[in-house]
C-alpha cells in the first residue's frame, strides 16, 4: 500500500535541505522498495512456485508458471493506452509548439511506459529535463523502485521535492552509501549520503534547474497506489501450485 513520505513544512527551506532527514526518507523507501521489486518479479515471471520444494522428494515438482501477472498488466495497459493520448487545439489556445515538443520527446512511448509502471507498481514517475547542451525539454519514465515524492505535513499534502536514488555498497569496507538526485521547485541537489557513528555525512552539489516546478511528476494507479495484480498474487500462487 502507498506510504506518504513527509517532511516538516515548518522551517522547510529548499536551499538548505536537512541531509539526515533525506537519508532517513531514503532508508524508509528502500524498505518499501523490496515490495515493489517483488511486484516487478511477478511481472517478469519470477513466481513463488519456482522456489517450491516437495516434502516427498520422489514426487513431481514441475514448477510451472502461468504468468497471469503479466497478462493482467499488459491487458490493462493496452486498454488504457492502446490508442495514444490526443491533444487538440482549442479556440483559446494554440498548442502546435507543444505538440512539436511532444513529438521530439516521443511522449507516446513515455505515456505507455508510465501506464505499464502504474499497472505493475501502482505508481509511475515521469522526469522532465533539458537535453544536454540544448534548451529543448525531454521526458522519460523513471523506475518507481528508486523514486519517491515527499510531501509536507499539512492536511493538503503538498509536494515539496522528489528523490531519485540508488544504493552503492563497498563490501571491502562493509559500508553502504546512497547516490541521490533531489529536485525541489527550483533546485537540483546531487548528494552522496552515508551514515556513520557521528551522523549522516554527505557530498553535495546544488544547481538551479530553471523549470520553476518539481521536474518529477508522480502518477498513481488509484488512491492507494495499488498495482493491477497486486491483490491477486495469492490467487496466482495458488493457481501455479
Predicted regions and their residues:
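Extended, helix-rich architectural segments
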Residues: 1-139
